[in-house]
Regions:
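Extended, loop-rich substrate-binding clefts of extracytoplasmic carbohydrate-active enzymes
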Residues: 1-7, 12-16, 84, 88-145
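Beta-strand-rich N-terminal accessory domains
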Residues: 1-49, 68-70, 74-85, 271
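Active-site loop/turn microenvironments that scaffold catalytic and metal-binding pockets
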Residues: 43-103, 200-201, 205-207, 213-215
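Short, well-ordered beta-strand segments enriched in hydrophobic/aromatic residues
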Residues: 11-13, 23, 140, 148-156
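Acidic (Asp/Glu-rich), glycine- and aromatic
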Residues: 151-180
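Conserved small/polar residues in nucleotide/adenosyl-binding loops
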Residues: 309-319
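Active-site/ligand-binding surface loops and adjacent short beta/alpha elements
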Residues: 176-261, 266
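Acidic/His-leaning functional-site neighborhoods
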Residues: 98-103, 108, 245, 251-308
Length: 320
């Protein structure tokens, strides 16, 4: 139960290979993904907490569906169709992830449809300062090829800002196994968005070639984290939006692959969105509740690959 007395429901999606995904209606969250290594050994490969209450307003938003707007809005101010809106400032001088009571910290309505779980909520006009009533669905499918598909659907009656995503952290060596800095990443991206000192995009595109942010071929995170490259050093690690090469609206395309050499596990990310945020868990230490493995996470114990849009009145957003 939540502190407000709302029921928390856990769902398990299991396939014929023995892999499984566990979800909860609190934050439309992924709380466990169990998948085999190259020897067939099953391990949980996403971060999470030992007790349900650990998910209540956790700063890491571990595994949860974030909105209305994932990431930061400078000074909590935005202009939509010529009108200025003020939002909660909850991250230094910025608005982050839709505010304190964002979608990650709410109970979603939930139901089972055949072999998938559908979760939904309604965000009223003015919720957290945003214009328009917003109706949201998150659909979770898991098949026998170990493919987990998350589809976000959103519809509004006023033009608004919507940026929905799932904030799952992977550790493909297994949850609780330590640092992910030796994981290897390949991205279909040759450019990144420049960020200012407040981690707000400036609108300028930077070439990744020749820098520690060039992941067009597999490379681990460790050399970049250890470098003096200012775009990484200033944020204590990777916390940057990478622009997807060849992106086309509403087309599901391959963004990249994360792999862990020792176990042989890998995750290939596909998305219909124009960019992906890579975050190496730079601030996990000290801020997380007791973990599933009974300890506390250190910085860099998980990596999030977060796909990141204006939604106009009476349009429907479909985000895969």
């Amino acid at each position: 139960m939540t502190p407000e007395g709302e029921a928390i429901i856990r769902y398990t999606l299991r396939n014929d290979s023995g892999a499984e995904v566990q979800l909860t209606n609190y934050g439309a969250a992924i709380v466990s993904v169990k998948m085999p290594d190259r020897e067939g050994r099953i391990a949980d490969v996403v971060l999470g907490y030992k007790h349900p209450e650990g998910y209540f307003f956790d700063g890491a938003a571990s595994g949860k569906s974030v909105g209305r707007c994932a990431n930061r809005i400078a000074f909590g101010q935005m202009t939509v169709e010529g009108k200025e809106y003020r939002l909660e400032v909850n991250n230094g001088v910025n608005h982050l992830h839709g505010g304190t009571k964002n979608f990650a910290n709410r109970i979603w309505e939930s139901r089972v449809e055949t072999n998938r779980v559908v979760m939904s909520l309604v965000s009223e006009d003015g919720d957290q300062g945003y214009p328009g009533e917003l109706c949201v669905e998150a659909v979770f499918d898991f098949d026998d090829d170990n493919a987990l598909e998350i589809t976000y659907l959103a519809r509004t009656d006023k033009t608004t800002v919507v940026n929905l995503t799932n904030h799952v952290y992977f550790n493909l060596a297994g949850e609780g196994s330590g640092s992910v800095l030796d994981h290897e990443l390949r991205l279909n991206s040759s450019k990144i968005l420049e960020m200012n000192e407040r981690q707000i995009p400036t609108g300028k595109l930077l070439d990744a070639a020749g820098t520690p942010q060039d992941f067009r071929e597999f490379r681990s995170f460790r050399p970049g984290i250890s470098s003096e490259f200012n775009h990484i050093r200033d944020f204590k690690g990777y916390d940057h939006p990478f622009v997807v090469d060849g992106w086309k609206p509403n087309i599901l395309g391959e963004v990249g692959t994360l792999r862990e050499p020792r176990s042989g596990r890998s995750v290939t990310v596909l998305s219909s969105q124009p960019s992906v945020m890579i975050y190496t868990g730079n601030w996990l230490a000290g801020g997380c509740p007791e973990t599933k493995s009974g300890g506390r996470y250190a910085d860099y114990d998980g990596v999030a690959t977060v796909s990141y849009t204006h939604l106009r009145a009476h349009e429907t957003l479909r985000h895969l």
